[in-house]
């Protein structure tokens, strides 16, 4: 079973199943309708999508055929439900700690993130006690047998921390990289502040030139 050949929609589907298994276990496994809603929800998703039932069903069918998702047909219900077998089950080759599971889940539904972002967004999945705990889990995911499962990306402009990205989605299918809104806002503010600083310096230079011209009688 290959863990490195999932496309973007398949990754979003697995991430949502992992998330709901932890955060709303009483509603898990998920029906197709519930899974579509989970994939397209506005909060805790990057990018926000508008996947159709057909797109999600196609992804589910592909994942079921590869043993990464199981379809459950309960005798008392006409609606099929789905649960993942991606990790941490008796059928999974991939066994992750709770911290590692939270990180992979977050990356599957929100893309590349910094250690600080992973810690602040993981509350319902896993309670990281420190940034060091996040770093240790990331290091483990980089060195696990069969990995690396995450990789460190180049530093973004205007960003102090570097982001980590999962290594499961094929690069050709990955959405175009974009800076987070927080990063973009921060970088824009820095540029605006620099422009104002330069404008103030130019104004002072012009004033000084005028003073020198007046003093020389020009």
Curated annotation (Swiss-Prot):
InterPro entries in UniProt: DUF480 (IPR007432), WH-like_DNA-bd_sf (IPR036388), WH_DNA-bd_sf (IPR036390)
Gene3D superfamilies per UniProt: Winged helix-like DNA-binding domain superfamily/Winged helix DNA-binding domain
Record Pfam families: DUF480
Family statement: Belongs to the UPF0502 family.
Protein name as annotated: UPF0502 protein Mmwyl1_3509
């Amino acid at each position: 079973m290959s863990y490195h050949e999932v496309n973007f929609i398949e990754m979003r589907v697995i991430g949502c199943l992992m998330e709901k298994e932890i955060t709303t276990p009483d509603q898990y496994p998920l029906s197709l309708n519930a899974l579509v809603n989970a994939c397209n929800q506005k909060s805790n998703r990057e990018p926000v999508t508008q996947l159709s039932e057909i797109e999600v069903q196609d992804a589910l069918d592909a994942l079921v055929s590869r043993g990464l998702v199981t379809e459950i047909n309960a005798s008392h219900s006409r609606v099929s439900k789905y649960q993942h077998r991606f990790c941490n089950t008796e059928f999974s080759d991939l066994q992750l700690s709770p911290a590692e599971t939270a990180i992979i889940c977050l990356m599957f539904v929100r893309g590349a993130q910094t250690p600080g972002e992973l810690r602040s967004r993981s509350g319902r999945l896993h309670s990281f006690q420190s940034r060091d705990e996040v770093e240790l889990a990331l290091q483990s995911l980089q060195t696990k047998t069969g990995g690396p499962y995450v990789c460190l990306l180049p530093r973004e402009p205007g960003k102090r921390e570097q982001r980590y990205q999962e290594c499961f989605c094929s690069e050709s299918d990955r959405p175009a990289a974009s800076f987070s809104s927080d990063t973009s806002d921060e970088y824009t503010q820095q540029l605006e502040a620099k422009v104002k600083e330069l404008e103030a310096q130019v104004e002072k230079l012009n004033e000084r030139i005028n003073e020198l011209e007046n003093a020389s009688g020009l």
